[in-house]
Amino acid sequence: MSTVDWKNYEPVLIPDIKDLHKIDVYEKNGGYEALKSVLKEKKKWPDPKSVVNEVKEANIRGRGGAGFNAGLKWSFMPPADGKPRYLACNGDESEPGTFKDRKLFEYNPHLFIEGALIAAYAMEITTIYVYIRGEYKVYIDMMDKAIQDAYDKGYIGKNILGSDYSVDFYVHSGAGAYICGEETSMLESLEGKRGYPRVKPPFPAQRGLWGRPTTINNVETLSHVPAVIKNGADWFKGIGAENHPGPFLYGISGHVNRPGVYELPSGIPVLDLIHEVAGGIRNGKKLKAVIPGGSSTPVLRADQLDGITMDADSLRTVGSMVGTAGMVVMDEDTDMIDVLWRISHFYHHESCGQCTPCREGTGWLEKILLKIKNGDGEVKDLDLLLDITTQMEGRTICALADAAAWPVRHTINRFRDEFEARCKKSVHELA
């Protein structure tokens, strides 16, 4: 049973403050105070490494899906050598079910900017890029405006806030490729190349953008940093689940009465998110299934959700992941064959084609699922689909093949009766 007190939580990422996207309003509500602190309060922050240590202690786990400790990632950057090094901020959210970063771009862009500036200072980085999906044209324009305002106020540029630290900040628009959300593919795109993932090692911290050390963080991840600097690591660790602390931006979509983005602590019960926060299943229907963290996270049946909370440890017990916390809710009338085909169609369309198991595997998955969907499938096709997923997973440069395989494997295994009934109906009608 969850002990997280989510009902009394006060938002810090998207608080209810009018016009918070404007720099003057942001400043009046404590904005950029954390940046001023790390630059000027030398007793508290004697050097950049002290900032890294505080963020590492807070255990801000990446909000882009992997869940890696952000401060630990920062610590992998080698010592500064006077040559360029980069921070690349990943705002290329393109996975079905995920739409939370755009809330920050729209509503509280300066929080993200401040977090990125603190991160850059902590790693002695002088150039920041934020990569935003091309379809987010309105949010790209908003970020351009916010960054220019920060330049005008002296938060970005030469010797910011009278310190000896200088930094530049650029917005880079994507061109509609989901694969560029993969960190090394994003680096290729930033360099003006086709978005092909790179073989690792070397990892970006050793050889990243233009061959120089680079750290890549998700937009929401960086947006947590100012509050950690202001309030301390222990404050952050006191919010939500013990091993996956802090608030999340939950993007809830599908068959609920109140879809949207909600900021709440990690560790909130899945059923509370659906029935209390999002207003329950629309039209009085029953809950059938939930994809908890974006389309790559394994689907869960309604009967698996009792006592399950939105954090890595809890979801792992039922064979799923928190991912990006982009929850897709499905009611009793949902056709799971159609859902799975649509997901597989997406991954086939978005595969870059560099690796054979992914290029060919995603195509076969979509083709066979379309056959079943159209009423021409056989029961043996289900085992063929499962076999194909085993030939894809762990055999490619990046994790897109895994992301395509997991939904197929788990949806078939958890809704096998529904798939078999469709296949048997096909055979019966053919006879």
What residue spans do the PLM features occupy?
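Conserved phosphate/anionic-ligand binding catalytic regions in large, soluble enzymes, centered on
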Residues: 56-77, 174-188, 192-193, 348-360, ...
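Cofactor-/ligand-binding subdomain signature composed of acidic, glycine-rich
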Residues: 1-52
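Gly-rich Lys/Arg/Thr-decorated short loops/hinges at beta-loop-alpha junctions or inter-strand turns
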Residues: 26-33, 89-101, 204-210, 251-256
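Histidine-anchored nucleotide/phosphate-binding helix
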Residues: 108-122
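Short acidic, glycine/serine/threonine-rich loops at helix termini
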Residues: 66, 71-74, 98-101, 140-145, ...
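Short amphipathic, charge-patterned alpha-helical segments
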Residues: 115-119, 266-282
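Hydrophobic alpha-helical positions that pack around
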Residues: 5, 140-266, 278
